[in-house]
Structure formats: structure tokens, C-alpha cells
């Protein structure tokens, strides 16, 4: 099946689902998940999204004299403060290009497709923006996505709840929790409807899940690695990932090494 054929079939795929049969495992769900983001899309997003939260930004402020700036000679031999380290960035940019994990992705879904409850890989910061969706009319239903989000500080309670009450390990992305399960949860749950132009920021290690609605939703997503997320990855996320035999994709120790090299020069 080509992407064109898939896009033309989304209306038919959407019409399968009703409020009474959405849990039927026999219904066909075709979700284009984790596909490479087209270069033209990534370039346009780079022009729109603030640089400090965009993919592979190098953590350097545009102004001089920022936090961490040091005195250094300019082209005239005068000592001036250089550029400081920005409060946000993506330390994946410290790695040589051939070592970087490609995580600028796209998601194309229809009513009934979903992302099961999970946490972002290696405790990274997640970013998800809806760039296009169907609208009511011409045989289509308005597209949006429903997010169920939790907080980083309650991650242990969430993990225990999923394991003891729902019978699923949050480290294994296989279970989509029902609304009633979220209602009974002993922790805060944030339900958000994402529409075109909405940027969802996903905290590190915060379990979340997504349900797609309507005929079509198209989203772009990326992850960022920072000093704080690296600490969480080394001490918590990676040991848990090893317990379920999940490969490390982000080369966290290499990121630390190359970042120290970069900023010590």
C-alpha cells in the first residue's frame, strides 16, 4: 500500500468505528507511526518553532553574555564575553551525525488508531505538534487527538497502578488504558484535546497515551535530551529499560562524553 492509497482510504477506515465497537480487535487500524519526517516539513517547522525547543538545536544562546559565557578575545584581540549556554537545547546535537538517533518523526492516523501508554525513551523530553487534520464536511469528520498525560513527580505511583491494578508494565508499550481506569487513578491525569497547531510538551518519564479521532490527523514529533534528562536516564530510565530487554537508542553516555568535549574546548 502506498501512502497515497492510505490517505484515500482513511474515510473508509474511519467509518468502521462507532461508540459501541471501538474496542473490537477485528476492526482494521492502519497507523503510520514513527515514519521519517519529510525534510521540507522539518525545515518549515524549524522556521516556526522556537529554536530552544526544536530538534537538534545546539544549546547556544543567540545573545552574548548569557549564562555560562566566558571571556574570550574577539577579532580585534579585545576580551569580550562569548555566547552562553541556553536554558534548553538538545544535547543529541553534540554527537557526530553518524551517531545520532533519528527521532524527527511523523504520525498519520484515523479514528480508532492510538499510541498505548508509555514513557519517552531515555527519559527525554517529548514534543508533538499537529500539522494537519481533516475538517467536518465533504464526507469527513473533524480530526483531533486526545492525550492522557501524567506528571513526572508521580511516575512511581503511575507505574505501580498500571502493574498492580491494570496488570501491565508501563515500560512495555502495549496497553491502552480505558477512561474508567484513568478516572479511578490515585494520581493527577491531564486530558487534552490536540488540534491543528497545538504543540504538546511531554515531561520526562511521564506516562501518557494518545487516541486519534476523526478522519485524519497528521503530526510531527521529536525528542530532546538535556542535562536533566540525561541524569534521569542514567539513574532510572536505562536500568528499567534493561529489565524489559529494550535497546538503548540514544547513546546517553556518548552524549555526555561529546558534550563535555564540546563545551570544554
Task: Please identify what each model-predicted range represents.
Residues 2-198, 206-265:
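Active-site region of the double-stranded beta-helix
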Amino acid at each position: 500500500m502506498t501512502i497515497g492509497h492510505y490517505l484515500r482510504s482513511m474515510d473508509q477506515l474511519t467509518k468502521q468505528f462507532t461508540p459501541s465497537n471501538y474496542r473490537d480487535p477485528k476492526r482494521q487500524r492502519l497507523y503510520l507511526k514513527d515514519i521519517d519526517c519529510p525534510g521540507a516539513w522539518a525545515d518549515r517547522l524549524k522556521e516556526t518553532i522556537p529554536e530552544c525547543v526544536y530538534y537538534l538545536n545546539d544549546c547556544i544562546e543567540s545573545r552574548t553574555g548569557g549564562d555560562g559565557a566566558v571571556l574570550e578575545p574577539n577579532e580585534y584581540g579585545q576580551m569580550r564575553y562569548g555566547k552562553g549556554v541556553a536554558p534548553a537545547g538538545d544535547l543529541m546535537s553534540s554527537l557526530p551525525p553518524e551517531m545520532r538517533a533519528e527521532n524527527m518523526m511523523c504520525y498519520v492516523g484515523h479514528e480508532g488508531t492510538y499510541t498505548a501508554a508509555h514513557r519517552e525513551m531515555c527519559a527525554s523530553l517529548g514534543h508533538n505538534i499537529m500539522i494537519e487534520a481533516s475538517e467536518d464536511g465533504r464526507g469527513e469528520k473533524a480530526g483531533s487527538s486526545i492525550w492522557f498525560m501524567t506528571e513526572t513527580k508521580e511516575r512511581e505511583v503511575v507505574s505501580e497502578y498500571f502493574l498492580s491494578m491494570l496488570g501491565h508494565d508501563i515500560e512495555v508499550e502495549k496497553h491502552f488504558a480505558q477512561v474508567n481506569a484513568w478516572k479511578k487513578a490515585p494520581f493527577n491525569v491531564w486530558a487534552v484535546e490536540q488540534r491543528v497547531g497545538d504543540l504538546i510538551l511531554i515531561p520526562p518519564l511521564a506516562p501518557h497515551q494518545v487516541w486519534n479521532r476523526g478522519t485524519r490527523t497528521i503530526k510531527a514529533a521529536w525528542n530532546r535530551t538535556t542535562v536533566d534528562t540525561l541524569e534521569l536516564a542514567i539513574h532510572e530510565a536505562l536500568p528499567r529499560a534493561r529489565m524489559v530487554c529494550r535497546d538503548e537508542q540514544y547513546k546517553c553516555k556518548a552524549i555526555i562524553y561529546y558534550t563535555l568535549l564540546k563545551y570544554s574546548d
